[in-house]
Design a protein with these regions (language model features):
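Conserved phosphate-binding/catalytic loops in two-lobed NTP-binding clefts
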Residues: 79-93
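RNase H-like, metal-dependent nuclease domains and their acidic two-metal-ion catalytic environment used
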Residues: 1-83, 105-159
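Short, surface-exposed amphipathic charged segments that create phosphate/polyanion-binding patches used
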Residues: 92-103, 120-123
């Protein structure tokens, strides 16, 4: 579960994006849930608690910063990890593009807000919002990190 936090209920503000993804033994990434809502801190915290109960993620990544600290306090006891923006959003998306290019990303059709994520991907980087794209990239990168090494697609090819 990866979270790109925002706390504003204004229509023009970025929502808090949440993406749940899983990885199979063949290196396929499955996007299972997408959330993108303008909630208060407490409403977002409750939603994250529900996602934790539903999906039991090994880790819950929250983009670091002031809002990340607020959520970390609110969600103490959950398997939280801080996510750092180590490059601009376009570079981060490019870092996982090989999984799209090789057909290793699957979007579950009944996943919440999957069409909204698709629309953001098609409009990126010129769309009004990119929060779901960023959360998805974080989710994929969290799945592929083994210690400090980013695992490559080749590591999943079975002989």
């Amino acid at each position: 579960l990866a979270i790109d936090p925002a706390v504003s209920q204004r229509d023009t503000a970025d929502p808090t994006a949440k993406v749940v993804a899983s990885l199979d033994q063949f290196g396929n990434v499955f996007v299972r849930y997408v959330g993108n809502d303008r909630f208060s801190v407490s409403e977002n915290g409750a939603g994250i608690q529900r996602l934790n109960a539903r999906f039991s993620p090994e880790r819950i990544g929250i983009e670091e910063g002031a809002l990340g600290l607020v959520f970390k306090d609110l969600l103490a006891g959950l398997p939280l990890v801080g996510l750092k923006a180590n490059a601009d959003k376009t570079s981060r998306l490019i870092s996982v593009s090989r999984f799209f290019e090789s057909g290793k990303i699957y979007f579950l059709q009944n996943a919440n807000k999957i069409q909204d994520l698709h629309d953001q991907l098609m409009e990126f980087p010129n769309g009004a919002h990119d929060d779901m794209v960023d959360a998805m990239v974080y989710a994929i990168r969290m799945l592929l990190v083994d210690g400090q090494k980013l695992v490559s697609a080749d590591d999943f090819i079975l002989d």
